[in-house]
Structure formats: structure tokens, C-alpha cells
Curated annotation (Swiss-Prot):
It is found in: Cytoplasm. Regulates arginine biosynthesis genes. This is Arginine repressor. It comes from the Bacteria. It comes from Bifidobacterium longum subsp. infantis (strain ATCC 15697 / DSM 20088 / JCM 1222 / NCTC 11817 / S12). One of its GO terms (molecular function) is arginine binding.
């Protein structure tokens, strides 16, 4: 195991490819399909230009001029950040709005973070967490009123627990 924890492995499926493209668009400023293709290859996903073009079209990805003049792919309003805007800060602001009204408690337990919500809200909270690329978080499992956030190690769970609590308290 590396110092940063286990790497995310994806099956060779269309859904996994679309998920990888979505994550790449959320975490990088992608200016060309060849740049996106290289990022996908680094993740072990080989894709033809034609398939990549169809995938981007299906995702409604469009090239948008950013504030600095760069033309990059974006998907909806939660896509690539413009110059001076950190994707992490924007993601935190979105998460804070959701978590503020829905999180009732947060606790770290081993490599897990346990997040309690009102009845029926856990699935929504988990999906908000899953949509953000959060370092050290592998994924979530949600029940009716509890979300388990699976982290790469115990220390990450403690730091992510504190972070989620601070977002919920804003």
C-alpha cells in the first residue's frame, strides 16, 4: 500500500469510464480531448477519440471560456473552476449548504466517519459527499439516518470527521 492509500480501481465499463471523465472534469482544467485521454490512460482507461467525443456529448460537456481566457470543458455549473476559484472551496461551499441543515452528529471510528442525519436524509448527504473529490475518502455507505464515510486510514478519518463537522457548523 502506498503512503497516500489505496488507488481507486475502475472496472472496464461504460459507467466507470463516464465516472472517471466526470471526476477528471471536476478536478482538472481540461482544454482538449487529447489531454482528457491522457488523464484517462493514466487511470488505466483506454478510450478512442470517437468514444470520448460521444461521452462528452452525452454528459453535455461544452467548451467554456474561463475568466483567464482559457477555453476548457465544463459540465453544468459544478464543472471546472475559473481562475482564482478553487474547486475545493466551491465544493466545500456546496457541501456546507447541504450539511448545515442535515447533519446531527459526526464521529470518527477507526478508518470510518459516522455521520448522523434526520430520518431519510442519509442517502442525500452521502451523494453530496460522493460527488466531491475528497482526498483520503474512498466512498460512502448510507442507510436511513446514518452515513459511513470510508477513509484510507484512521488519521484521515479523524481529519475528515473534524472537517465535515466544521462544514456542518457553518
Amino acid at each position: 500500500m502506498s503512503e497516500t492509500g489505496p488507488s481507486l480501481q475502475r472496472p472496464a465499463t461504460r459507467a466507470a469510464r463516464l465516472s472517471a471523465i466526470e471526476q477528471a472534469l471536476a478536478t482538472h482544467i481540461i482544454t482538449s480531448q487529447s489531454q482528457l485521454s491522457k488523464i484517462l490512460i493514466d487511470e488505466g482507461i483506454a478510450v478512442t477519440q470517437a468514444t470520448l467525443s460521444r461521452d462528452l456529448d452525452e454528459m453535455h460537456a461544452v467548451k467554456t471560456r474561463l475568466k483567464d481566457g482559457t477555453v476548457a470543458y465544463t459540465v453544468g455549473r459544478s464543472a471546472v473552476a475559473s481562475e482564482g476559484e478553487d474547486v475545493g472551496e466551491r465544493g466545500e461551499a456546496q457541501m456546507s449548504r447541504v450539511l448545515n441543515g442535515l447533519v446531527t452528529s459526526v464521529a470518527a471510528a477507526g478508518n470510518l466517519v459516522v455521520v448522523h442525519t434526520p430520518s431519510g436524509a442519509a442517502q442525500y448527504v452521502a451523494s453530496v459527499i460522493d460527488r466531491q473529490p475528497i482526498e483520503g475518502v474512498l466512498g460512502t455507505i448510507a442507510g436511513d439516518d446514518t452515513v459511513m464515510v470510508i477513509c484510507t486510514n484512521d488519521d484521515t478519518a479523524v481529519s475528515r470527521s473534524d472537517w465535515l463537522l466544521s462544514l456542518a457548523s457553518k
